[in-house]
């Protein structure tokens, strides 16, 4: 039943506006500011799904960019016999590579929506009413490992039970959590999980709350990148 309700209300929008606050011109500016591995957050007003989500921010994803941008940003990261990231992705993650080769979509994100873990154009998360981007304060090598972890989840189904302890299905902020999870060979991000309905949960809003709580701390794990809303673009 929970899955049926979630699918039924996804995309239901009661706004009278045809266009979102973030315009195509804004997105062109946003593209210039983003770097691979950035964490993106969005909100649309008057969407029915907002009622069931805690806090202001309702969705999150990870910015990939394009093959050229990946190669340029991670050009100093050794990848065995592969000369660049795009070559490595072609060998290890061929489905990801094929999707990124579709130049008509420009730049890409990886996110979890109703069909599951997908690679979509940047517009899917940026052409909205409110958009923000945060940059993990991590070495490039660890950001690349986080992206590779996300790529490994491509095609997994959506987790309608919002159970962060399962790995075979994911929800949007769970992709962020597990992609940037610390391991023996990877520095990562630390998130405080919140208990909801007997489960541990990380919501998109929790990510922003973490950024806000740590903003003036020497141990802050995010840099601010960009924020757009109806009144202010900064």
For each feature predicted by the language model, list its residue ranges.
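Cysteine-nucleophile amide-bond enzymes
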Residues: 1-234
